[in-house]
Regions:
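N-terminal soluble segments of membrane proteins
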Residues: 1-15, 101-104
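Alpha-helical hydrophobic/aromatic positions enriched in membrane-embedded helices and signal peptides
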Residues: 50-54, 73
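A short, structured loop/turn motif at beta-sheet edges
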Residues: 56-58
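Catalytic Zn2+-binding segment of zinc metalloproteases
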Residues: 60-77
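Post-HExxH zinc-binding segment in Zn-dependent metallohydrolases
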Residues: 75-104
Length: 104
């Protein structure tokens, strides 16, 4: 997962990045890192001010849904704990970018 504060498509680095939607605060794309030949998820925030608790929660759920889809897992009442832990981990990663305080 990559987190960026930019509306750039980073086309020199990633494949699969959508053009910026001017009505959005943030966009999530499933991408391929061309430098390392790795798949992953890129979340872009329009600005540092767009990284709000509400947007972190919203984008984290999109990211977790994409990861569940990729691994063939279903989001349902039977495995909501696993999904919720993943959403929390994603939200924490985004919050580290927001605060500039990164965990080792």
């Amino acid at each position: 997962m990559w987190v960026a504060v930019s509306t750039d498509t980073f086309s020199d680095r990633f494949e699969g990045v959508s053009e910026w939607d001017d009505t959005a605060d943030a966009i999530v794309d499933c991408v391929r890192d061309k430098l390392r030949n790795l798949g992953g998820i890129l979340v872009r925030f329009e600005s540092k001010n767009a990284i709000t608790i509400a947007n972190i929660a919203h984008e984290s759920s999109h990211i977790a849904m994409n990861i569940f889809d990729y691994i063939g897992a279903k989001v349902d009442l039977a495995n909501q704990e696993t999904f919720s832990y993943l959403v929390g981990w994603v939200a924490d990663c985004i919050n580290q970018v927001r605060t500039g305080k990164f965990k080792d």
